[in-house]
Curated annotation (Swiss-Prot):
Belongs to the HRG family. The chain crosses the membrane at residues 21-41, 47-67, 89-109, 123-142. This is Heme transporter hrg-5. The gene is hrg-5. One of its GO terms (cellular component) is lysosomal membrane. GO terms for biological process: heme transport. Heme transporter.
Length: 160
């Protein structure tokens, strides 16, 4: 019985919007520090590019979480959610393809994972998975809110 209570509290903690906001802010800060380290120290331009993209997508995620917390996301248009969903799904699949291609090229050309300086496609591929995570998370959030908008819209039409 107590394990069910503790697991539900744990889920409540990690699913709470404040926790998601804090983790997203932490990811944005990690992204900025990695952008600087890839540019200044390691000169890994492909990983730098994808890190910058992840940071931008994380900023968009933060915007959605803050709108959810302030309950202003309910004022967004249905079409906005559809655009967010389809753009993020497309970007997620492109990033997933980038991940696969980077890992195949890194494996075939025998790039060492431990070699941090210069181009290292292992790191580029890892950042592509982060893009996939954030874009699909945004797409699911947009889909949930678009479904709620559609249900509310149909209830308003039925009442009229």
């Amino acid at each position: 019985m107590s394990s069910k209570i503790s697991s539900s509290r744990c889920c409540t903690l990690f699913c709470h919007v404040n926790t998601r906001i804090a983790l997203t802010i932490l990811d944005i800060l990690i992204g900025f520090s990695n952008i600087l380290s890839y540019a200044i120290q390691f000169h890994n331009w492909s990983a730098l590019t994808l890190t910058a993209m992840v940071t931008l997508v994380a900023c968009h995620t933060l915007q959605m979480f803050l709108a959810e917390k302030k309950n202003t996301i309910t004022h967004w248009k249905y079409s906005t959610f559809k655009w967010i969903m389809w753009i993020d799904i497309t970007l997620g699949f492109l990033a997933l393809g980038c991940f696969v291609v980077c890992f195949i090229i890194a494996g075939v050309t025998e790039i060492e994972f431990t070699n941090l300086y210069g181009e290292n496609l292992w790191f580029t591929g890892l950042w592509a998975t982060a893009i996939t995570k954030y874009t699909w998370q945004n797409a699911l959030l947009a889909r949930n809110y678009s479904n709620q908008k559609r249900i509310l819209k149909s209830e308003i039409v039925e009442d009229a």
